[in-house]
Curated annotation (Swiss-Prot):
One of its GO terms (biological process) is secondary metabolite biosynthetic process. It comes from the Eukaryota. Specifically expressed in conidia. Decarboxylase; part of the gene cluster that mediates the biosynthesis of trypacidin, a mycotoxin with antiprotozoal activity and that plays a role in the infection process. The pathway begins with the synthesis of atrochrysone thioester by the polyketide synthase (PKS) tpcC. The atrochrysone carboxyl ACP thioesterase tpcB then breaks the thioester bond and releases the atrochrysone carboxylic acid from tpcC. The decarboxylase tpcK converts atrochrysone carboxylic acid to atrochrysone which is further reduced into emodin anthrone. This is Decarboxylase tpcK. GO terms for molecular function: lyase activity; oxidoreductase activity. Its EC number is 4.1.1.-. InterPro entries: Dimeric_a/b-barrel, EthD_dom. It comes from Aspergillus fumigatus (strain ATCC MYA-4609 / CBS 101355 / FGSC A1100 / Af293). Belongs to the tpcK family. Pathway: Secondary metabolite biosynthesis.
């Protein structure tokens, strides 16, 4: 089999811990991200090899649910508005996506429409998967 058909041993996961633009409501933020930003972004991500992109919207209402889960080990609740996770194999492919002229023209400045880009934070690490769709698994699917 060719090199491209091999299953990588692991994938990188870029996690953006996002805050919404000051003055924007939680619902407007979620709506903009899911109805404007995501449709503009997802095909470009696929073009550059992104395997998965998800958003977790951490609203005031969902943060309140943490009161039911807190115990002596789980006491600190974060206040980020969203966790956006991008899973990919190649850091170089992701960097090439950010250099794509369409990204630069349409997406780079769009973040200012909904995100507090100065306050939001990011990290990257290896993703490991153990349960998928209710089934125990040993790693990510290709």
């Amino acid at each position: 089999m060719g090199e491209s058909s091999r299953k990588p041993s692991r994938y990188l996961c870029l996690t953006i811990c996002g805050y919404r633009k000051p003055g924007m409501s939680e619902e407007d933020y979620r709506r903009y991200m899911t109805e404007v930003s995501a449709p503009m972004t997802k095909d470009l991500m696929v073009k550059y090899g992104v395997k998965r992109w998800t958003m977790v919207h951490n609203t005031t209402a969902t943060r309140a649910l943490m009161a039911e889960l807190c115990d002596s080990q789980m006491t600190n609740v974060v206040d980020f508005d969203c966790f956006s996770q991008v899973v990919f194999e190649s850091l170089e492919d992701y960097k090439r996506m950010k250099q794509d002229p369409w990204y630069k023209e349409h997406l780079f400045h769009d973040h200012e429409n909904f995100a507090d880009t100065k306050k939001s934070m990011m990290t990257i690490g290896w993703i490991e998967e153990f349960v998928r769709q209710g089934v125990a698994v040993d790693g990510m699917d290709n």
